[in-house]
Regions:
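Active-site catalytic microenvironments in core metabolic enzymes, especially phosphate/sugar-handling
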Residues: 1-262
């Protein structure tokens, strides 16, 4: 098996052509011609993940977030990105990321959020091409809920310890917009689409001042997207059922954000 065989299969699920212009999805370290004997799937490409891959005999790491996102001027072993790059190269581990490519397919990040909330009539929030790909999604709750009810519902479905929210609506909520990861820039669009609730992450302070009849929730960047790791693994095992594909055993400790006082 070659690296290119694995990445080609992932790109059927999440095509590189749909990534955002600022993104760096794709093969980041290694060659499509490199031989691969095992794949390790994680969320962020950290030195710890590379070490885990090597210990498992994996020579390809697949993550959601790209290891190299913007241009870098130096590779420093004291920096987490630099350390991961050096460790991957020294160990002969190829590194691949499916970032906004996985955000923009309905079977990916936002679609997983919708399925977790059992939304009905789900469609792409920011449709592109023929309407089958794009950022975010929007759908209807099975049962209308007040703001406090939906807060409890989301907390339970996503297994959250905390949610940052604007003032909970007292009127029934039916239409919900979702965007995994940093979605603060799409708040106005969610409102324009008729959503009464918008669930995303990385919302800035002033965006919690919402107009009447609209509510936002910030459930955390990691928490909103982490299910994509299981989706990647399922895709690989479906296409290569006898190949060694692993999910990182450290996912429970992978979130770089730590919550205290809960």
């Amino acid at each position: 098996m070659k690296v290119g065989d694995i990445t080609a299969a992932l790109e059927v699920f999440a095509p590189l052509r749909i990534q955002e212009s600022w993104d760096n999805s794709g093969l980041i370290i290694g060659s499509p011609e490199d031989e691969v004997h095992g794949v390790m799937v994680g969320f962020d490409c950290t030195p710890e993940l590379i070490k885990e891959a090597v210990e498992k005999g994996c020579d390809l790491v697949v993550t959601h977030h790209p290891l190299i996102f913007k241009g870098i001027k130096r590779i420093d072993s004291k920096d987490p990105v630099g350390a991961a790059i050096m460790q991957a190269v020294r160990s002969g581990v190829a590194v691949y990321a499916a970032h906004t490519t996985a955000d923009k397919v309905i079977a990916g990040v936002s679609g997983a959020m919708a399925r977790r909330l059992s939304l009905k009539n789900v469609s792409i929030m920011v449709p592109e091409e023929d309407g089958t790909v794009g950022l975010g999604c929007i759908g209807d709750l099975e049962t209308p809920m007040t703001g406090k009810e939906v807060l409890a519902f989301v907390k339970e479905r996503f297994h959250l310890g905390v949610i940052r929210s604007s003032k909970p609506l007292e009127t029934p909520i039916t239409k919900v917009a979702l965007l995994g990861g940093s979605g603060g820039g799409e708040i106005q669009l969610a409102m324009a689409k008729g959503a009464q609730l918008y669930i995303t992450a990385d919302i800035s302070y002033h965006n919690f001042f919402t107009p009447e009849g609209f509510m936002v929730m910030d459930i955390g960047h990691f928490e909103s997207e982490v299910e994509i790791v299981d989706i990647f693994l399922a895709e690989l095992r479906k296409k290569f059922p006898t190949f060694a594909s692993y999910k990182s055993a450290n996912m429970g400790r992978s979130n770089p954000v730590h919550y205290f006082g809960l």
